[in-house]
């Protein structure tokens, strides 16, 4: 006789408001999760996803105060009554910001901390640590202090530390937001292993919708503290309008199926190819809505973008940290004025290290850098910063004023801008970024997306010719991500700014970048348009990158790299024959 697995998580009519806030972060939420299930929770920033995660292991309200009502039962315990110490052995929680849970002197010490507190023998602890570090590509970094890791390596360390505890329940709150595409794939592979081999229950809070299709048993979509949609991946992702309204990006294969009027919406690349091969589609009379109406669909070569003069020149640059580790190895690069460049590559490839040389935050061990035709050697950082603005990956690292308005005026005042000009620039930028109503608000009270916009705007206020943004979309939902990138593109197209982004998001690269610089092991390994880079599988593998799924589809169908589902649908409607039998 078949028996259903018992519920391991039960939340009934749970409502929560943070201390001092009248807004309900969770509003009458109920959910049951069976042992061994993988549940994906999607939704915009501020929907209540992280609040839900913290309630499951007792962090709320044990450490984060507020008003909690309703019933919560996790593995037979009430988390806030059992306490976080007892819950930690049952529920492993990985936060989206790794700095909140890294505190060891070395990577190995950090990964070993959790299993060491389970009373295990030393040999078992080190066995788990070694495996977890290997799974997360951290082998060789055992003795490195966590503060000297890249953002992605920090995130990998936090995940490894929780995995080493082998908890019954894994709650992963945007665990891949800082990881390169191969790192993301490894995390999802580990999730699958935990579920299938160890019987673990997994709660996965994510923005990476393409990977969820084949991983989650059920999907829940949250908005404004409530569940708006729930069901199997096919049931949920078929409701494309509702997903867009909730700030969730529709997977490329699903969007393409809708655009071509597929008889049955495909959910894998193989299903897309079979749909096209069998002719199980008909061009809709009214075109379906597309998420990717921006791009750059052309197949222009890089040469067509190189008419402007270089604004940044890098010649034979090497950089070594005080430890002797070489982070940059013979870099030669030119960035032309008015370009939109994405610098991509695996975690630790040297992307951030390179770009911090452009405004003097770092100085090369050897080699030369020219900014606007002038050698950067000996030029004070404050002078370079007036020409090359830098937005850090974590906005909280550069927000420190007491109000939003003061934050926007700080940089311009520092570089000697006239008071009347500062006032007019601040007013204009407040309107541009949609933060006028928050002018007198303390920045820490803003959402992550609002803080990201403020950090960007505080640099834009200084009117630099070059703007570097390190991971502009980390922790943001799809709507917020596009708002940030649309703003950057507007600065380039209308004001002639040169934009450089560092990103792991190939969907963002395909939509916005005119040029892609690929780094690996401290070197520039490739340079071209998105189409040119995505058409080089060896280069993509070397840099631990994965192209958007629609590029895989169009490559298989026509031997072409197209960047959006809309482009692919138009190509199909053109009636040209397929490249291969599918």
Give the positions of each predicted feature.
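The feature captures the beta-strand-to-loop junction immediately N-terminal to the Walker
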Residues: 42-44, 344-346
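Helix-to-loop junction immediately C-terminal to a conserved catalytic motif
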Residues: 57, 359
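Conserved ABC transporter NBD signature motif
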Residues: 65-77, 367-375, 384
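Conserved ABC ATPase "signature" region
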Residues: 123-141, 420-438
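Conserved ABC ATPase signature
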Residues: 145-149, 153, 442-446, 450
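Catalytic Walker B motif of ABC-type/P-loop ATPase nucleotide-binding domains
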Residues: 170-173, 467-470
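Conserved ABC ATPase "signature" C-loop
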Residues: 224-225, 521-522
């Amino acid at each position: 006789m078949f028996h259903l697995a018992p519920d391991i998580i039960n939340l009934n009519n749970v409502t929560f408001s943070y201390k001092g806030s009248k807004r309900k972060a969770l509003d009458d939420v109920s959910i049951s999760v069976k042992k061994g299930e993988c549940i994906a929770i999607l939704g915009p920033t501020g929907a209540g996803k992280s609040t839900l995660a913290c309630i499951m292991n007792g962090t709320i309200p044990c450490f984060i105060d507020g008003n909690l009502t309703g019933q919560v039962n996790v593995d037979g315990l009430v988390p806030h009554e059992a306490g976080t110490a007892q819950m930690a052995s049952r529920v492993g929680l990985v936060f989206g910001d790794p700095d909140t849970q890294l505190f060891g002197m070395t990577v190995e010490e950090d990964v070993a901390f959790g299993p060491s507190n389970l009373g295990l023998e030393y040999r078992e602890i080190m066995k788990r640590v070694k495996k977890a570090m290997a799974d997360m590509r951290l082998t060789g970094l055992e003795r490195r202090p966590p503060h000297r890791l890249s953002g992605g390596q920090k995130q990998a360390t936090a995940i490894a530390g929780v995995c080493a505890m082998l908890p019954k329940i894994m709650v992963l709150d945007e665990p891949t937001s800082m990881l390169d595409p191969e790192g993301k794939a490894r995390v999802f592979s580990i999730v699958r292993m935990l579920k299938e081999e160890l019987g673990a229950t997994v709660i996965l809070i994510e923005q990476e919708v393409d990977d969820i299709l084949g991983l989650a048993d059920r999907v829940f979509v949250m908005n404004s503290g409530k569940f708006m949609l729930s069901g199997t991946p096919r049931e949920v992702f078929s409701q494309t309008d509702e997903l867009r309204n909730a700030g969730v990006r529709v997977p490329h294969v699903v969007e393409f199926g809708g655009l071509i009027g597929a008889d049955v919406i495909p959910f894998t690349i193989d299903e897309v190819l079979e749909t096209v091969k069998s002719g199980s589609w008909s061009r809709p009379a009214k075109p379906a809505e597309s998420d990717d109406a921006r791009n750059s669909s052309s197949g222009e070569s890089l040469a067509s973008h190189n008419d402007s003069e270089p604004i940044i020149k890098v010649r034979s640059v090497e950089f070594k940290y005080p430890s002797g580790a070489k982070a940059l190895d013979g870099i030669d690069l030119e960035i032309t004025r008015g370009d939109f460049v994405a610098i991509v590559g695996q975690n630790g490839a040297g992307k951030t290290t390179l770009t911090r040389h452009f405004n003097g935050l770092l100085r090369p061990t050897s080699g030369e850098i020219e900014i606007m035709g002038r050698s950067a050697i000996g030029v004070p950082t404050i002078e370079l910063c007036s020409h090359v603005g830098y937005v850090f990956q974590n906005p909280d690292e550069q927000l420190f004023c007491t109000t939003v308005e003061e934050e926007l005026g700080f940089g311009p005042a520092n570089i000697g801008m006239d008071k009347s000009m500062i006032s007019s620039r601040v007013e204009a930028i407040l309107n541009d970024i949609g933060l006028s109503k928050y002018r007198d608000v303390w920045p820490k009270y803003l959402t992550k997306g609002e803080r990201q916009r403020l950090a960007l705007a505080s640099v834009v206020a200084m009117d630099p010719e070059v703007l570097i943004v390190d991971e502009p979309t980390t922790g943001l939902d799809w709507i917020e991500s596009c708002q940030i990138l649309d703003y950057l593109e507007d600065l380039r197209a209308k004001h002639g700014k040169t934009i450089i982004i560092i990103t792991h998001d190939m969907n963002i690269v395909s939509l916005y970048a005119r040029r892609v610089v690929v780094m690996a092991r401290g070197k520039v390994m490739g340079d071209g348009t998105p189409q040119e880079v995505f058409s080089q599988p060896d280069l993509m593998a070397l840099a631990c990158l994965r192209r958007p799924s629609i590029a895989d589809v169009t490559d298989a169908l026509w031997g072409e790299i197209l960047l959006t589902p809309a482009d692919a649908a138009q190509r199909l409607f053109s009636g040209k024959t397929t490249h291969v039998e599918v």
